[in-house]
Amino acid sequence: MNKKLIVGNWKMNSTFSTTKEFLKEFQSLYSLNSKTYNQKATFAVATPFTNLAALKDNDLNLKLAAQNMSFYEKGAYTGEVSADMLLDLNVSYVILGHSEQRQYHAETDENVNKKARLALEKNLTPIVCVGETLEEYLAGKTKEVVKAQLAASLKDLDVTKVIVAYEPIWAIGTGKVATAQIAQDVCKYIKELTSKQTVVQYGGSVNAKNIFELSSQEDIDGFLVGGASLKATDFSDLMLNLK
């Protein structure tokens, strides 16, 4: 059985206190389901920066991810968070180039590339997000957009050490989900552009009801999950319902 990589992206949700409540609830679920979880998945949550410390020393095999990081190592960059700060909190993964960062904070492929390069130097695993808008999808430009984003974001990087998350923008938080075949086709294309060894996730309204069919696809190695990861019971159901 190939284990899937499940990363819950909490976005700007939850507080330090509610994160501790999540951990307590997940601890109870883990005691019942740990064998299944660990057989089927590697699992992590990307909490807001302020909540990472609440999960730092968990003994549940629950890995930590950050939602962004700076491409500067340290210095007078108010509001930025460095790779070393993340490492000190036992963070394993960092999400880069999420469509919401691109939309609201003018994130560019070039900056994603600089961040990913630094992450790899620091032994953090970057999760580089790519995906098309609804307009681009309807115009048949999905692969064209994804190819351009990957070319710039992964320039001169070891693609076998980078995780790529395909998140069609039209499916993020909308309740719309790409069909399993669409997701499979694009994830397969990403592997063709990068490497068969590159881990490719799908993200976009993934939940416990559709994850079985999606996880049955040959080239989908995991999932970047939003709202369905905020509650411990929902997060648990994701792993239990994997193929």
Swiss-Prot record:
Catalytic activity: D-glyceraldehyde 3-phosphate = dihydroxyacetone phosphate
Enzyme class: isomerase
Gene Ontology MF: a single term: triose-phosphate isomerase activity
Pathway: Carbohydrate biosynthesis; gluconeogenesis; Carbohydrate degradation; glycolysis; D-glyceraldehyde 3-phosphate from glycerone phosphate: step 1/1
Single GO cellular component term: cytosol
Record flagged with keyword NAD: no
EC number: 5.3.1.1
One Pfam family from the record: TIM
Compartments where found: Cytoplasm
Entry keyword set: Cytoplasm, Gluconeogenesis, Glycolysis, Isomerase
One Gene Ontology term from the biological process aspect of the record: glycolytic process
Principal place of residence: cytoplasm
Active site per the UniProt annotation: 98 (electrophile), 167 (proton acceptor)
Gene3D superfamilies named in the record: Aldolase class I
Binding site for substrate: 9-11, 173, 205, 226-227
PANTHER family attached to this UniProt entry: TRIOSEPHOSPHATE ISOMERASE
Record-stated family: Belongs to the triosephosphate isomerase family.
Assembly: Homodimer.
Biological role: Involved in the gluconeogenesis. Catalyzes stereospecifically the conversion of dihydroxyacetone phosphate (DHAP) to D-glyceraldehyde-3-phosphate (G3P).
NCBIfam families (UniProt xref): tim
HAMAP family assigned: TIM_B
Name recorded for this polypeptide: Triosephosphate isomerase
Protein species of origin: Mycoplasmopsis synoviae (strain 53) (Mycoplasma synoviae)
